[in-house]
Every structure is written in structure tokens, then in C-alpha cells.
Swiss-Prot record:
Protein name, as recorded: Putative B3 domain-containing protein Os08g0325100
DNA-binding region listed in the record: 32-125
Pfam families per the UniProt record, alphabetical: B3 (PF02362)
Keywords: DNA-binding, Nucleus, Transcription, Transcription regulation
């Protein structure tokens, strides 16, 4: 009976391996140091995939994969292979930060083909994380690019519709006015200094010429008459001192011409865009704002409290500082280094700093340790303030 069941299991295992990789799913639980690993004296942000997962795939995992969530956000992760291990290296830290992965969360992978994996992210109680499903237009560059293209297309269509409704004679008048303006800029000469009497005489003579010289205010007035406006336009009243005017060609200000065209367009009211933030952004904002209950400066994380006889090496200090940044605790954290005497022997105890117990635990002598949803009751002994019963 046992041999037959073993043969059936092997046959089922082989049949599963022969399936297309697109039909296979893998559930990975975030446990231990899923964010980083220690190599020598360096902390490497990476994740090691169990070899049992890799062995069930027919094909090899490429050196670079795409992790795509339900909201169509894709993240590139580099894959390192060493000693039959598959490791998510570069890009994995950004993925963890974006979706606020914590210990106890889980991820379901499904091979999609072309080096792509569909990823479903669950929290500690098995609910799908909202930040991996909801589409955030503010963070998605593709949506932003699509919005920009749509806005440009809409503005272009409105501009063409305005030109189509104009009278052909008015359009021809605009073209002629533009050509005349360009011609006057190309052949304009410096304006000589004239007295008021001479200027009046020359002004009367200028009206008999083919191309009259006009001031910016007069050109704006003629432009407004050639293009009917829906509202009256007030002409600027400027006093020009011809005796101190510099020698430069007469040119029509582009601002006046643009102003007259802008007034012909209807005023558009635009409401400010509504942005939706992910849980990661809301948490970062909440811990960066000042609080009345906080006794430290804004953005400063309290230093951990370490036992009197405990000394951390440089690697352990890096690990502790890295974990504290992701815990966001408002009170100091007690750090203990587990030794062999703490986990072996007839009576295994763990010493806790008396200063930490007096200041943050008060008169409590029963505490609760929790990890991955489980809780264990611990009793504190007054002698040496060591954790005894329940440890």
C-alpha cells in the first residue's frame, strides 16, 4: 500500500513537471530576513527562492524578470544564480519598499512567459493588499504619459475647431497681417529722432505710404479691429518720449498679439487633480509629521536600548539599524543577542535591561511576545530582571 502510494506521488509529481509553466503557481511566505542577507560584513538586499520551487519549473529562470501586480505595475528584478540557488537581487529592495512588505506577508507567483511573473500580494491575515490592486494615476508614469497625450490631443482639436469656425476672410486677413508683420520686421529701419511738430508732419506723410509705421498701441488696436473680440479690450496708455528714444526698429510686441488671440478663447475652469496615496506613502507621512505625544524631534527614531553586557559588532549594528528604520516605533526598542545559554540547558533565561523594564514596562511582570500571529506569555523575575517562565 505504501509503495503504491509512493509510486502515485512520483507519477503525479512528474505529470506536474510536464505541465506548462504558465499553469503553475507558487506561494512564498515572507519569513526571516526576506529583505536582506548578511555576506561577511555587508548587508545585501535580496531574497533567496527555495530550490523546491525552482525544481518544479521546466525552463530556467532568466537573469532578469518582470514582477507584475494586479494594477499592471511592472518591476524589473535581477536574478543571481549560485550553487543551485535563485536569488532576487537588484530591484527587490524597491519592490519591498513600494508594497510595504512585512514579515508574515505572502506572495503568489505565476509564470506568464517572456520572463514575466504575475504576483498577488497578501497581508498577514490572507487579505490581498490594496496597494497592489488599486491603480494610482499619480504614481504610474504610463498613466501620466497617457493623460499628457490626451490633453495635447484635446487642445489640438479645440484649436482646430476654433480655426474652422472662423470666417475665411478673417483667416485670410490673419495670414496677410502675419506676412506684413514679418516683412516689416525684415525690412524695418531705425526710427530717427523727431520733434513733435516734425513727427506730426511725418505721420501725415506716412499715411500715404504703402506700409505705414505704427506704434505698438495702434497696431494692437488695428489687430483687435481685424479680429472681432467677444469683450472690449482696453488699450494701454503709454507716453513715449521721442527725444530720448533709442534707435531700434519698430516691432509689434508679441505679447499684445498673443493677448488678443487669448481673449477670443473661452475661459476654461480646471479642477486640481485628485491624488490617491498608497499605504506606504500614508505611513511615511504619518511618521514624518509632528505629534503631541512624541518626545523627540520629528523624523528622529529613538536609539535602541542594549543590555549592559551586550556588545554588537559592526555587522549586527547595521542589521539593527536597518530593522529599526522599518519598525517605526515611538519608544526605544530593546535589543538582545541570543546566545547558546539562552536557548539550551535546563533553565534557559534571557536578561532584560532593568532601565528598560522600569521606564517602559512599569510594574508589569507578565509580558507577551508575538511573532507571525502567535503570542506567548512570559513572566519576568525580579532577580536580575531575567525572562524565565514561558521563555
Amino acid at each position: 500500500m505504501g509503495t503504491w502510494c509512493e509510486r502515485c506521488r512520483r507519477r503525479d509529481e512528474q505529470d506536474y513537471r510536464n505541465l506548462d509553466d504558465c499553469q503553475k503557481h507558487f506561494l512564498l511566505l515572507m519569513m526571516g530576513d526576506f529583505q536582506h542577507e548578511i555576506r561577511g560584513e555587508q548587508i545585501v538586499e535580496q531574497l533567496t527562492i527555495p530550490k523546491e520551487f525552482v525544481q518544479r519549473l521546466k525552463g530556467d529562470i532568466p537573469e532578469e524578470i518582470q514582477l507584475e501586480t494586479h494594477n499592471r505595475n511592472s518591476y524589473t528584478v535581477r536574478v543571481d544564480k549560485s550553487q543551485e540557488k535563485v536569488i532576487f537581487a537588484a530591484g527587490w529592495a524597491q519592490f519591498v519598499k513600494t508594497f510595504d512588505l512585512h514579515m508574515g506577508d505572502s506572495m503568489m507567483f505565476r509564470f506568464k512567459g517572456n520572463s514575466q511573473f504575475d504576483v498577488i500580494i497578501f497581508d498577514q491575515v490572507g487579505r490581498e493588499k490594496v496597494c497592489s490592486v488599486a491603480v494610482d494615476d499619480y504614481l504610474d508614469p504610463n498613466v501620466q504619459e497617457g493623460r499628457t497625450d490626451a490633453t495635447e490631443t484635446l487642445n489640438s482639436s479645440r484649436a482646430h475647431s476654433q480655426d474652422d469656425y472662423l470666417d475665411p476672410n478673417v483667416q485670410e486677413g490673419r495670414t496677410n497681417a502675419t506676412e506684413t508683420l514679418n516683412s516689416s520686421r525684415a525690412h524695418s529701419q531705425p526710427m530717427p529722432m523727431q520733434t513733435p511738430a516734425t513727427e506730426t508732419l511725418n505721420s501725415s506723410r506716412a499715411h500715404s505710404q504703402d506700409m505705414p509705421m505704427q506704434s505698438p498701441a495702434t497696431e494692437t488696436l488695428n489687430s483687435s479691429r481685424a479680429h472681432p473680440q467677444p469683450m472690449p479690450m482696453q488699450l494701454p496708455t503709454e507716453t513715449v518720449n521721442h527725444f530720448h528714444a533709442p534707435h531700434y526698429p519698430m516691432q509689434m510686441p508679441i505679447e499684445n498679439m498673443a493677448l488678443s488671440r487669448t481673449q477670443a478663447m473661452p475661459t476654461q475652469m480646471q479642477s486640481p487633480p485628485t491624488y490617491r496615496w498608497t499605504q506606504v506613502q500614508r505611513d511615511n507621512l504619518r511618521y514624518s509629521l509632528p505629534s503631541e505625544d512624541q518626545g523627540c524631534r520629528v523624523g528622529v527614531i529613538p536609539d535602541p536600548i542594549i543590555g549592559r553586557r551586550t556588545k554588537l559588532n559592526p555587522v549586527q549594528e547595521k542589521v539593527v539599524n536597518f530593522k529599526i528604520q522599518h519598525i517605526h516605533s515611538e519608544i526605544p526598542i530593546f535589543v538582545a543577542v541570543i546566545k547558546r545559554s539562552n536557548v539550551s540547558g535546563v533553565l534557559s533565561t534571557l536578561s532584560v535591561a532593568k532601565r528598560y523594564v522600569d521606564e517602559y514596562l512599569g510594574g508589569e511582570r507578565f509580558i507577551s511576545l508575538s511573532r507571525l500571529g502567535g503570542k506567548w506569555g512570559i513572566r519576568l523575575l525580579l532577580v536580575g530582571v531575567g525572562v524565565a517562565q514561558g521563555w
